[in-house]
C-alpha cells in the first residue's frame, strides 16, 4: 500500500516540496507532492522499508526554515506512476497554514553575492528556498509566485531552469530573480534622479552605480532612505555627530536611541561587549536588533561612534546586514564596492516621522520622507505588508523580546488548548493584534502606537490581511477596557452579531505570560508591573499583584493610589509626578535640587490641581513610581520617549546593586486587599538625597526595595492560597535589575517563576492574553455580551 501524508506547519515558502522531491528520489519512491491552502500533501509508494525511512526523515532532515506541527499518515491505493512529481498547488476552501517570516540572506547566497564568476554577483535581490522575503510579499496562499509581489517579474530562461531543476536549491523558490529578469535598485536625490541600474544591463559597473552612489553619500555625511524587506530605513554615518544630530532634528526624535547596522561581527565586537548567546542571535537567520553593552574603554571610540546615537545609555541596539542590499551597502572588501568606501557602522532607524508607521511604498516614501532624507535608494519589488525590525536582548541565555516583528512574525504561538476563531485587538501602545484558531495564536507584526490616522490604517490593513491569509472569521472580538483607546472603539463598531468581550489590561498581561509558557487554565500569582492600564474601578493601574487564571482574576495587592497632575502631561514631565506624590503624602520637598529649574507658578498650579482633584487621575502605576523617583533624585524632569527616566536610572544603578540595601516599606491591609504604602519609601529616598548620597546608590536601593516588595507580596499570597507559581508580565519587567532580583529571589524561596519566552512582556504581547482570556471567559462574560447586543440594537 502507498502512504498519503499530510504535513501541517510552516511548510510553504521554505523549500519543503523540493526537499520532499529529493528525499523521495533518493529512496526510490514514486508519487507526488503538492501545496494546498492547508499545508503540504504527499503520496508516496515503494518498498515498505523505504516508506518508513521517508516518514522518519521528513522530520529529521526538514529544511532549516520549516517548522512541522503535525504529520498525519494514512494508507492509500498504490500509485501507478513510475517517478516522483511536484504537482500544481491546490486551493482548499477554508483551509490555512502558517507562513514563514522573512529571513536573512543565507551563507550560500552571500557567497554567490560576492563571487565575481556568479551570475548574481553584486545583485541585491539574490535569494533561494532558504532565505529572502516571505511574509512581506505574500498576498495569498497557497504560496506560489502569482500570489506574491514577484508576480510582476516573469522569470528569464536561466531562472526558469533553476526553478524547475529538482537538484537546485532554487527549485520552486518563489522570489527567484537575477539581473536579467528581477527587481532593480535606483537612487534618487530629493530633487533629481541619478543614472541607475536597469534589470537588463549586464555591466556590473552600471548595475551597481546606485549602490556606489549611496555609499558615497553615506560617507560624505548625507542621510539616505533605503527600501528594505519590510519598509524603509533612514541611514547615516554613525560616527558623524553632525549628521546624527541632523537626523534627530529632522525626525523629531531627540533622545530615543537609534539602532545601528555594522558591517560584520568583528566590527561589533570592537565596540560592544559580546557574549556567545548574543553573537548567535546577531548571526541567526532572523538577524534581529540585539541590545548590547557598549565597551567602556577604547572600543566605543574605536570607530568614533557618536554618543548621540544612544545618549545616556550603556547599551545600544545593533544588527548585522540581513538583505543582499544591506551587504552591498556595508561591504568593506569587494574590489568594485571598495571604490566608494563606506563607514563600517551606520545608523539604521525606521523610515518615518516619530510615531508614524514606516514607509513601504516608493511614491509614499518620496513624498513623506523627503523632509528627512537627502537621497532615496529605491527598488521596484513591492512590499505587501510592512514589518519593522525585531528588537531582542539576551536574558540569562534566553531571548527577551522587546519588539517581535521581522524574522519572527507571523510564526504562531502554539497553545496547549483549542481556541475559537478570535480577534484580539491589543492595546493603544506598542500595538500588535492576535488572531486565533485551532491550537494557534497568530500574534501580528509590530503595529506601533495607534494614536494617529496612518498607524490606525496600518492596524486595520494588517487585520484584514492576516485574517485572509489564515482564513480566520472571528467568532469573538476582544478589546481593552479603556473606553478611549482606538482599538477599543474599533472592536466595538465591528460585527455586532458576535460576542464582544472587554478584558482588563493587567489580567491580559498575566494571561499572556501563562500562554507564552504553555500553561493550562490554572490560578497563578501574577505580578503585572507597567506604566498604565485601565482598572475595573476606573483608575489607572500598573503596580498589580493578581490571583489570576484565564477565566478570571482577583486583585490581591497594589501600589498606593496617587495623583497624576495633568494626566497624560505628567508622563512627559516626571517632576509633575514627583511633586504630585509628595504633596499628596505630605512630604516636604521644597528644598530638593530637582525643583531648582521648575517655575514657581507651575508648582502652584500643580498644587491646586492635586488639592482640587482637577485633571489628576489616580494611579497605582509602577512605571510612574519609577519616573517619580528618577525625578526626585535628579536624573530627569522631562522625558522625550517612554520610560526614558527609568532606563537612565537603571543605567546609573547597575554599579551599586550588589552592595545596595533596601529602603523600609510598609504593606498595609485594606478592605480591598493589600496596599503598598509609599510615604515611608519616598521619605527614606529624600533623606538620602538631602544627605548627598550618590544618585546611583539611591537608584540601586530603590530597585532592591521594589524587588523585596514583589517577593514579599508573593509570600503573602502563597500563605493565603497555597499558590506557588508566579507569572511576571508588563513593560517594567524589561528592567533587567528588577527582573533578575525578583526572579532569582522567588526561585530561592521555592516559587516557580515564569517570564515571557516568545512574545514581549510589554503591550506587544497584550493581545495574546486577551485572546486566551476571551476563550475561557465566554460564560462569565455572557452578561457583558448581552448588554453589548442590547446597546448595539438601539
Annotate each PLM feature.
Residues 1-175, 179, 184-186:
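Intrinsically disordered, low-complexity, mixed-charge
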Residues 75, 231-298:
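A phosphate-binding glycine/aspartate-rich beta-alpha loop in the early core of alpha/beta enzymes
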Residues 146-147, 162, 334-419, 619:
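Internal gly/pro-rich beta-alpha loop/helix module
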Residues 175, 182-184, 427-457, 461-465, ...:
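A contiguous, well-structured pocket-lining segment that forms one wall/lid of small-molecule binding clefts
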Residues 269-275, 328-329, 358-363, 389-390, ...:
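Conserved phosphate-binding catalytic cores of ATP/NTP-utilizing and phosphoryl-transfer enzymes
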Residues 480, 497-509, 724-729, 736, ...:
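Conserved phosphate-binding/catalytic loops in two-lobed NTP-binding clefts
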Residues 506-529, 533-535, 574-583, 703, ...:
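Glycine-rich phosphate-binding/hydrolytic loop that grips phosphoryl groups
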Residues 514, 519-581, 588-591, 611, ...:
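Active-site histidine-anchored catalytic micro-motif
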Amino acid at each position: 500500500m502507498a502512504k498519503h501524508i499530510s504535513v501541517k506547519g510552516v511548510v510553504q515558502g521554505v523549500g519543503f516540496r523540493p526537499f520532499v522531491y529529493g528525499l523521495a528520489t533518493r529512496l526510490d519512491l514514486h508519487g507526488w507532492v503538492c501545496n494546498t491552502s492547508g499545508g503540504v500533501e504527499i503520496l508516496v509508494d515503494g518498498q515498505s522499508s523505504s516508506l518508513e525511512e521517508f516518514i522518519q526523515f521528513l522530520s529529521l532532515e526538514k529544511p532549516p526554515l520549516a517548522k512541522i506541527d503535525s504529520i498525519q499518515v494514512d494508507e492509500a491505493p498504490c500509485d501507478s506512476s513510475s517517478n516522483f512529481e511536484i504537482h500544481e498547488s491546490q486551493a482548499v476552501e477554508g483551509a490555512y497554514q502558517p507562513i514563514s517570516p522573512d529571513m536573512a540572506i543565507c551563507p550560500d547566497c552571500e557567497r554567490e553575492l560576492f563571487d565575481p564568476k556568479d551570475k548574481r554577483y553584486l545583485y541585491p535581490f539574490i535569494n533561494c528556498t532558504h532565505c529572502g522575503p516571505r511574509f512581506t510579499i505574500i498576498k495569498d496562499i497557497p504560496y506560489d509566485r502569482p500570489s506574491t509581489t514577484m508576480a510582476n517579474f516573469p522569470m528569464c530562461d536561466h531562472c526558469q531552469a533553476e526553478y524547475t531543476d529538482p537538484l537546485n536549491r532554487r527549485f520552486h523558490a518563489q522570489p527567484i530573480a537575477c539581473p536579467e529578469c528581477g527587481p532593480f535598485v535606483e537612487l534618487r536625490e530629493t530633487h533629481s534622479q541619478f543614472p541607475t541600474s536597469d534589470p537588463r544591463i549586464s555591466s556590473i559597473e552600471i548595475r551597481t552605480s546606485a549602490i556606489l552612489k549611496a555609499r558615497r553619500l553615506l560617507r560624505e555625511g548625507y542621510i539616505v532612505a533605503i527600501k528594505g524587506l519590510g519598509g524603509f530605513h533612514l541611514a547615516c554615518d554613525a560616527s558623524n555627530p553632525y549628521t546624527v544630530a541632523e537626523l534627530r532634528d529632522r525626525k523629531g526624535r531627540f533622545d530615543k536611541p537609534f539602532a545601528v547596522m555594522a558591517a560584520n561581527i568583528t566590527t561589533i565586537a570592537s565596540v560592544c561587549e559580546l557574549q556567545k548567546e548574543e553573537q548567535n542571535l546577531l548571526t541567526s537567520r532572523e538577524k534581529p536588533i540585539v541590545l548590547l553593552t557598549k565597551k567602556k574603554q577604547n572600543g566605543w571610540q574605536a570607530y568614533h561612534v557618536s554618543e548621540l546615537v544612544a545618549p545616556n545609555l550603556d547599551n545600544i541596539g545593533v544588527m548585522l546586514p540581513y538583505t543582499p542590499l544591506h551587504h552591498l551597502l556595508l561591504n568593506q572588501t569587494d574590489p568594485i564596492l571598495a571604490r566608494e568606501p563606506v563607514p563600517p557602522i551606520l545608523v539604521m532607524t525606521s523610515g518615518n516621522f516619530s510615531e508614524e508607521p514606516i514607509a513601504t511604498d516608493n511614491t509614499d516614501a518620496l513624498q513623506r520622507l523627503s523632509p528627512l532624507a537627502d537621497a532615496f535608494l529605491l527598488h521596484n519589488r513591492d512590499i505587501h505588508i510592512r514589518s519593522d525590525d525585531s528588537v531582542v536582548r539576551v536574558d540569562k541565555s534566553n531571548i527577551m523580546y522587546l519588539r517581535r516583528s521581522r524574522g519572527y512574525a507571523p510564526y504562531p504561538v502554539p497553545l496547549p488548548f483549542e481556541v475559537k476563531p478570535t480577534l484580539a485587538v491589543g492595546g493603544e501602545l506598542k500595538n500588535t493584534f492576535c488572531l486565533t484558531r485551532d491550537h494557534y495564536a497568530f500574534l501580528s507584526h509590530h503595529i506601533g502606537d495607534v494614536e494617529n490616522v496612518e498607524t490606525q490604517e496600518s492596524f486595520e490593513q494588517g487585520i484584514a490581511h492576516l485574517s485572509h491569509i489564515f482564513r480566520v472569521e472571528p467568532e469573538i472580538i476582544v478589546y481593552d477596557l479603556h473606553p478611549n483607546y482606538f482599538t477599543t472603539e474599533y472592536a466595538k463598531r465591528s460585527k455586532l452579531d458576535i460576542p464582544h468581550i472587554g478584558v482588563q489590561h493587567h489580567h491580559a498581561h498575566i494571561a499572556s505570560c501563562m500562554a507564552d509558557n504553555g500553561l493550562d487554565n490554572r490560578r497563578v500569582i501574577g505580578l503585572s508591573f507597567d506604566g498604565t492600564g485601565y482598572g475595573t474601578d476606573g483608575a489607572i493601574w500598573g503596580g498589580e499583584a493578581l490571583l489570576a487564571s484565564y477565566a478570571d482574576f482577583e486583585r490581591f495587592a497594589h501600589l498606593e493610589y496617587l495623583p497624576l497632575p495633568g494626566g497624560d502631561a505628567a508622563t512627559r514631565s516626571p517632576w509633575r509626578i514627583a511633586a504630585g506624590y509628595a504633596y499628596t503624602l505630605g512630604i516636604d520637598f521644597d528644598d530638593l535640587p530637582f525643583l531648582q529649574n521648575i517655575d514657581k507658578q507651575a508648582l502652584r498650579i500643580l498644587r491646586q490641581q492635586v488639592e482640587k482633584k482637577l485633571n489628576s487621575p489616580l494611579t497605582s502605576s509602577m512605571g510612574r513610581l519609577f519616573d517619580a523617583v528618577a525625578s526626585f533624585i535628579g536624573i530627569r524632569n522631562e522625558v522625550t520617549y517612554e520610560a526614558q527616566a527609568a532606563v537612565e536610572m537603571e543605567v546609573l544603578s547597575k554599579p551599586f546593586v550588589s552592595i545596595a540595601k533596601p529602603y523600609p516599606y510598609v504593606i498595609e491591609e485594606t478592605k480591598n486587599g493589600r496596599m503598598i504604602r509609599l510615604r515611608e519609601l519616598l521619605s527614606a529616598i529624600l533623606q538620602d538625597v538631602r544627605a548627598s548620597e550618590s544618585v546611583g546608590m539611591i537608584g540601586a536601593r530603590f530597585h532592591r526595595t521594589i524587588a523585596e516588595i514583589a517577593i514579599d507580596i508573593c509570600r503573602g499570597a502563597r500563605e493565603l492560597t497555597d499558590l506557588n507559581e508566579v507569572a511576571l508580565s508588563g513593560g517594567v519587567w524589561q528592567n533587567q535589575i528588577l527582573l533578575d532580583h525578583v526572579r532569582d529571589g522567588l526561585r530561592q524561596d521555592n516559587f516557580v517563576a515564569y517570564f515571557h519566552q516568545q512574545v514581549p512582556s510589554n503591550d506587544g504581547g497584550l493581545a495574546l492574553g486577551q485572546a486566551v482570556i476571551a476563550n475561557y471567559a465566554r460564560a462569565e462574560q455572557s452578561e457583558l455580551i448581552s448588554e453589548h447586543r442590547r446597546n448595539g440594537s438601539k
